[in-house]
Amino acid sequence: DVTIFESGAIVEYVLSRHGGGRMRPSPDSADFPSYLQWLHYAEGMIMPPVNTIVVETILLPPERRNDENVNRATKLLSRMLQAVDAHMEGREYIAGEFSGADIMTGHACTVSKRLGADVSDKPNVEAYIERCNARPALKKAWTV
């Protein structure tokens, strides 16, 4: 039995052990560096401000919430999503075909929007979220 508790590590482990070469570019592919970058960008750059927003607006009791923390996190999240928007210009998925990087980044973008991040000025992010969420497996996962 194996226990892994970080989502990026879980995605890498599952794809390495059970992916059969699917859902990630091969290491010699031109898409592989982008795949790695965005696989880790989701948890390293998008999710920290998301987590701050969750803590400050949902988890903390009202008397302990700090609006300034939410404002800073919201601004940071907008910048992080702007980078995704720029990368997604002319692309359907992060690194060519749908991959583990899209599992991570698509989820981070979706959660950001569901928490109220304004993506109306980020049309590539908006379209990317819609594409990811239109995938049958993800539709099924959201119902569990």
Regions found by a protein language model. Give the residues of each.
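Hydrophobic alpha-helical bundle segments that form small-molecule/ligand-binding pockets
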Residues: L81-A95
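Alpha-helical packing segments of well-folded alpha/beta enzyme cores
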Residues: A73-M80, Y128
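Active-site rim elements
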Residues: D67-T74, E92, L115-D118
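Alpha-helix C-capping/helix-to-loop hinge sites
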Residues: R17, G21, P61, G90-R91, ...
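GST-like domain detector, emphasizing the conserved glutathione-binding G-site
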Residues: D1-E68, K75-S78, D85
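Residue-level signal for nonpolar/aromatic packing positions in well-ordered secondary structure
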Residues: I10, V84, D102-I103, C132-R135
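Long hydrophobic alpha-helical segments typical of transmembrane helices together
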Residues: N124-V144
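GST superfamily/GST-like fold recognition
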Residues: M45, P49-V54, Y93-D121, E126, ...
